[in-house]
Amino acid sequence: MSVMFDPQAAIYPFPPKPTPLNDDEKQFYREKIKRLLKERNAVMVAHYYTDPEIQQLAEETGGCISDSLEMARFGAKHAASTLLVSGVRFMGETAKILSPEKNILMPTLAAECSLDLGCPIDEFSAFCDAHPDRTVVVYANTSAAVKARADWVVTSSIAVELIEHLDSLGEKIIWAPDRHLGNYVQKQTGADVLCWQGACIVHDEFKTQALTRLKKIYPYAALLVHPESPQSIVEMADAVGSTSQLIKAAKTLPHRQLIVATDRGIFYKMQQAVPEKELLEAPTAGEGATCRSCAHCPWMAMNGLKAIAEGLEQGGAAHEIQVDAALREGALLPLNRMLDFVATLRA
């Protein structure tokens, strides 16, 4: 790499785990959230990786469960004046970029993402400046500032198609921030891709040794893998794809048992899609190792019922997402470029 910052060497302190609630407390906060959503003219959008009780509440209140971009697009189309975003901070920023006129609230602004943290704007800008002949493509899991520095924003569901398109135009690519997804895209397309070296702390922990042992126990199970996983895991997969693509694969594959290599939060919607199938968590520790994330993002876990209620009730600087107007305009350009590209794919 041509910059001093090394995402692979960075260690991000995990937040403390939320204090567990008893059943009475859970019911109290569920009812409080439902009341506050009505009072605030708000709708709740939740990511696939949040805890099951959060996703369930989003469903019960007419909200949305999806990936980060679809969460933001749902909010932009919804009549509510306030969006409660249950996810991590860059997701709230994306919602604000697409809905600047709305109040964007989060349970906590301290919910981070290792991909976002691993791609600080100053270092990334210097990296881009060192390679001015390359088109800059950044994953949706980045800050508004990084998006504004990019030519394109992309999601994992269309990453291969977009890079194929740019490669057909003879363009060389800078890809950021996830090195595993960038490597996957490069191998699928053969494009000239220079990768930033970030990684998701959840997907980076999947290990081939432990997975091989699990496959021996369940020899007839299919393996579903998110492309943020290491190449060695991707090569073992029966299906590779984004969160929504993995849920579709779960329905399409004939296997009755599915080993799932992504954040276990996805099990809520995946099990709804295939109630007759057995879902198994892919192991995240190799021989003699211990997991850090254990297949669940610690920042996603910060989106608890109590925090959601506090976000709706208190608002203010501790919960409201703000994006500078100039930064928003800069980030909106590559986002809209991607949305236009998606529209052409579906036409």
UniProtKB/Swiss-Prot annotation:
Assigned EC number: 2.5.1.72
Pathway as given in its UniProt record: Cofactor biosynthesis; NAD(+) biosynthesis; quinolinate from iminoaspartate: step 1/1
Cofactor(s) required, per the database record: [4Fe-4S] cluster
Keyword hit for Iron-sulfur: yes
Cofactor: binding details: Binds 1 [4Fe-4S] cluster per subunit.
InterPro entries: NadA (IPR003473), NadA_sf (IPR036094), Quinolinate_synth_A_type1 (IPR023513)
The organism's place on the tree of life at top rank: Bacteria
GO biological process, one term: 'de novo' NAD biosynthetic process from L-aspartate
Cellular-component GO terms for this entry: cytosol
Main location: cytoplasm
Gene3D superfamilies listed in its UniProt record: NadA-like
Pfam family for this entry, one: NadA
Keywords of the record: 4Fe-4S, Cytoplasm, Iron, Iron-sulfur, Metal-binding, Pyridine nucleotide biosynthesis, Transferase
Binding site for iminosuccinate: H47, S68, Y139, A140, N141, S156, H226, P227, E228, T243
Catalytic activities: iminosuccinate + dihydroxyacetone phosphate = quinolinate + phosphate + 2 H2O + H(+)
Protein location: Cytoplasm
Keyword set includes Translocase: no
Enzyme class per UniProt: transferase
Residues reported in the UniProt entry to bind [4Fe-4S] cluster: C113, C200, C297
HAMAP family: NadA_type1
Biological role stated in the UniProt entry: Catalyzes the condensation of iminoaspartate with dihydroxyacetone phosphate to form quinolinate.
Family under the similarity heading: Belongs to the quinolinate synthase family. Type 1 subfamily.
Name the UniProt record assigns to this protein: Quinolinate synthase
